A protein has these predicted regions:
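Short loop/turn segments at secondary-structure transitions that flank enzyme active sites
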Residues: 58-61, 98-101, 145, 170-171
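Helical scaffold of the NTase/Pol beta-like nucleotidyltransferase catalytic core
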Residues: 1-34
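A basic- and aromatic-enriched beta-loop-alpha substructure that forms the phosphate/nucleotide-
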Residues: 65-142
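Conserved nucleotidyltransferase catalytic core and NTase-mimicking acidic/glycine-rich helix/loop elements
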Residues: 123-250
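Catalytic metal-binding acidic patch
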Residues: 37-78
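Conserved aromatic-histidine-acidic binding/catalytic patches
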Residues: 3, 7, 45, 79, ...
Length: 253
């Protein structure tokens, strides 16, 4: 059995070819490229697309211009590939702001391309810039928005349960003082103290999700639904958490 989260050699070659094309077309160098989304989290469906995210740097003369230049590269989304990149200076600014999405990218289990020395130095800075306060708010807000938007009917799109459950477990992880939540859902779930019946329901739903299509609908899951509701209510009163971000700006230069 091959997990849907694996990337076969043909798709990996296609992604790498796309990255080479980006380097030539935009005159940049890709320093890091990974999977975000369901394949990075570890609960992809057979027909999940590939969410490729990358960090890139321009040639020196680009940084000497007076006018600010566009710092994002976005390609048109096709039936399988969703490709988007952030310029390196923008990425450093996001780390300075303790952006949880950016921090997740650096923990992706699926890496297509990497300047190991540069990216290792960047990863080493994460603990100094990570903000429990900002991360917890990011994950809680995401869960609340997705719950209100996708899980209100008696029949729901099954994948959306994970778009509420994962950020809620990440918020709990942060509240428990464990630091940066792991990107992989399996690690996040293993580190969460959930009752056996709830864990069994999540495992069963995960199996369905990995077997069914992205658009699969099913009846509301009462036990899981009740847990999500209770966590969202509990989260309305945020705990006192440090903002941290004790990093040295000189390290980002």
């Amino acid at each position: 059995f091959r997990s849907n989260n694996d990337v076969d050699s043909a798709m990996r070659a296609r992604v790498c070819a796309q990255l080479r094309d980006i380097e030539q077309r935009y005159n940049v160098r890709v320093l890091y490229a990974c999977e975000s989304g369901s394949r990075g989290w570890g609960f992809a469906s057979p027909d999940s697309d590939y969410d490729v995210r990358f960090l890139y740097v321009h040639r020196p003369e680009w940084y000497l211009r007076v006018e600010a230049q566009r710092d994002v590269i976005e390609l048109p989304i096709d039936d399988e590939l969703d490709v988007c990149g952030w310029e390196w200076r923008k990425a450093l600014g996001l780390l300075k702001g303790a952006n949880p999405t950016f921090i997740e990218w650096l923990d992706s289990p699926v890496v297509y391309q990497e300047d190991e020395t540069v990216v290792a130095e960047l990863r080493a800075l994460i603990p100094a810039w990570f903000s429990p306060l900002r991360a917890r708010w990011h994950y809680y807000s995401m869960a609340r928005k997705n719950f209100r938007g996708y899980l209100q009917g008696e029949t729901v799109r099954l994948k959306k349960y994970f778009y509420v459950l994962r950020p809620l477990l990440a918020a709990r992880w942060v509240e428990a003082g464990k630091g940066v939540p792991p990107m992989r859902f399996a690690e996040l779930l293993a580190g969460s103290e959930l009752c056996a019946p709830l864990r069994a329901e999540i495992d069963a739903l995960l199996e369905i999700k990995q077997r069914a299509g992205e658009a699969e609908y099913g009846p509301k899951r009462p036990l899981l639904h009740a847990f999500l509701q209770s966590e969202l209510v509990r989260g309305e009163v945020p705990p006192v958490l440090p903002d941290s971000r004790e990093g040295n700006l000189k390290d980002l230069d």
